[in-house]
Amino acid sequence: PKPNGFLVLDEVPPAIHLWLLSTGTGLGPFLSILNTPEPWQRFQRVVLVHAVRTADELAYRRTIARIAEAEPKRFAYIPFLSREAADYALAGRIPQAIGDGRLEARAGLGLDAALAHVMLCGNPAMVADATAALAARGFRKHKRKEPGQISMETYW
């Protein structure tokens, strides 16, 4: 069966960079996307962000490591931990890291509405707050009749 809805690459307008921002189990749809040829054919850089409470909740580490090994110059993985600290992860929450620039700094890539498309999947509060943080930077929700730079799905 062919995936449908808005959280599929068929619905993403042309962009140079693809940012995939997830919390918890919202990571799943993005791994499905990353395990196809399409993102690597369409985008110069892909950034996968996964936010959870503790390191034990960081899922699919082998799958993500395999993607990073296959696309070392084009793929960045940024884990977030909200309830404990680790050198390899950003602390706190995704929307705040968008606002204060930590997300871009860790990715080594600017979050620019002229170049990027952002897909959000996960906790409804993260989706809403990240959408607001991105809107403050000129990003708009993508609609079929009004192309924008943000696609989203709450996944709780």
Regions found by a protein language model. Name each.
Residues 1-19, 36, 82, 137, ...:
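FAD-binding FR-type
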Residues 9-12, 39, 108-111:
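Glycine-rich helix-loop-beta junction characteristic of Rossmann-like nucleotide cofactor-binding loops
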Residues 15, 38-46:
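Conserved S-adenosyl-L-methionine
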Residues 18-21, 119:
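Conserved beta-strand elements of the Class I
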Residues 23-29:
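Ser/Thr-glycine-rich phosphate-binding loops at phosphate-binding pockets of nucleotides
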Residues 29-39:
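Histidine-anchored nucleotide/phosphate-binding helix
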Residues 31, 47-50:
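Extended, folded domain segments that form the structural surfaces/walls around functional sites
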Residues 49, 54-156:
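Reductase modules of NAD(P)H-dependent flavoproteins
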